[in-house]
Amino acid sequence: MRFSDSVVLIFGGTTGIGLMTTIDFIIHNTSHIILASRSKWKWKRAIEKIQNIFGDLVNLSNEFNISVLNSTVEYIPCDIRIENDVKQTIQKTIDKYHYINVYFNNAGIQPTTGHTDGDITEIEIPSEKLFDGTIVYKISQNNSNNDNLNNDNSNNDNSSVCSTPASSYCENPIATFIMGMTFCLKHEVKFALEQKSNIPVSIINMSSRNGVNIPSSDRPIYSACKAFIHSMTQTIATQSAKLGIEKNRSIRVNCIAPGPILTPLEIPIFLPDKKNVFEPLSNLELQQFQEIGSHGVPMKRTGTTNEISPTVLFLADYNQSSYITGSTITIDGGYTASPLIG
């Protein structure tokens, strides 16, 4: 069986592409799948989605663990913006299962409100220099009364001026995509070099079409941060290959760059009036999403999550992609290949 001995850690695996990838790993008999994310309520929702697909084959072991077919799926609360969260999540997983051979760095945000992206003259990143010379950058946590930001019905997630309709956390692309990705790659490579089991390790990063060669002028910070992920994939792949040779380890680092995909994170971009992005779209909303989202896409449509997840599994599978590292695969209906198509 394809992934029968695999331990897969997905940062951001409870919704959208991450959840679809989780489902695909279950279908392919992955032994252990660990989902690390900030919102426990999204984990509960993910369980419901998995139950809708697999029905009575899903067994709830406890509130943080389910078993499905030949797989166990476990939830670990983790905020990748906090380095110790990342380190402890990986450490807990290795302590329990002894190794991790697939990492999917999929935690994502779509800043649509506040001052974390958009007009460069309006962006706010509070900073100050302390008496000892330390420079501190702050992520604000001001409360917001915007109903679009309160879809979780949870008292644990604090709404803020930089939240999004998909999350009531403060959504700063620099904190998640630059700091968070750096923390993930640092500890993934470190643990991959140190873990006892000498098995191939695949690290897959999530970038975007806007991070490859067509940045969004409406979201310069988001685009630049996604370009950072593309660049880091190449440099860390090179480092990991060299370090792996020294320690007799196979560590591959690759990246995917999707185009417009129907997910809770993408809906606010094309349907800004949609109040709850976790509810199914009406036929009219789906038509509007397709029309707006497919602008510039030669295939004249948006994509779906099940058109992304097979590429993640391909890169995760050493038998199929053992000579691929440092690559970014665009999955965008031809958008980046034909940027002038309207």
From Swiss-Prot:
Q: Which residues bind NADP(+)?
A: 9-31
Instruction: Answer yes or no on keyword Oxidoreductase.
Output: yes
In the UniProt record, does the keyword Oxidoreductase occur? Answer: yes
Transmembrane spans: none
Q: Provide the GO MF annotations for this entry.
A: oxidoreductase activity, acting on the CH-OH group of donors, NAD or NADP as acceptor
What are the UniProt keywords, alphabetically? Oxidoreductase
InterPro entries from the xrefs? NAD(P)-bd_dom_sf (IPR036291), SDR_fam (IPR002347)
- Indicate the residues that form the catalytic site: Y222
Where on this chain does substrate bind? Answer: S208
Enzyme Commission number: 1.-.-.-
Which family is this sequence assigned to?
Belongs to the short-chain dehydrogenases/reductases (SDR) family.
Q: Which PANTHER family would you find in this protein's record? A: SHORT-CHAIN DEHYDROGENASES/REDUCTASES FAMILY MEMBER
Question: Per its record, how is this protein called by name?
Answer: Uncharacterized short-chain type dehydrogenase/reductase R419
User: Origin organism of this chain?
Assistant: Acanthamoeba polyphaga mimivirus
